């Protein structure tokens, strides 16, 4: 995906990028400093959440948030991230109830990546994969169900 100059100066995207970068830095600090691991994970989570809030269309923001939850051992938080992503993608979050027996700490990041591969948040990537008329009809029906 190419960034245009308009993307670089979009205030919400810039804030999302800044918070994501901070979250990644705190994740690295959590790995490097076991004594302050929990504190750094909390800061990483706070920044990762802010990144998603400022720009929920950036797949990296979702990936970093899921990684923070996984490293923190928060299976319930991972499920909540997936539910939120499913809502953003126009999917029924109740579909996750089929996965109640699955260990979210092991599978959530893979599920998140699979969901983003099936329904990219980038509009151009989505159009390339779903631009056919029958796909658009399915998408339209899915949106009306929400």
For each feature predicted by the language model, list its residue ranges.
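Residue at a conserved register position within TPR or TPR-like alpha-solenoid repeats
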Residues: 26, 68-69
């Amino acid at each position: 995906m190419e960034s245009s100059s308009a993307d670089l100066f979009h205030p919400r995207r810039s804030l999302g990028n800044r918070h994501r970068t901070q979250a990644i830095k705190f994740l690295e600090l959590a790995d490097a400093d076991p004594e302050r691991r929990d504190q750094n994970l909390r800061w990483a989570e706070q920044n990762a959440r802010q990144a998603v809030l400022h720009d929920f269309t950036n797949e990296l923001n979702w990936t970093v948030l899921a990684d923070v939850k996984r490293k923190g051992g928060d299976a319930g938080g991972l499920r909540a991230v997936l539910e939120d992503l499913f809502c953003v993608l126009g999917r029924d979050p109740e579909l996750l109830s089929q996965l109640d027996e699955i260990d979210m700490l092991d599978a959530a990041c893979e599920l998140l990546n699979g969901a983003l591969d099936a329904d990219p948040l980038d509009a151009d990537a989505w159009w390339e994969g779903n631009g056919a008329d029958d796909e658009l009809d399915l998408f339209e029906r899915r949106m009306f169900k929400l």
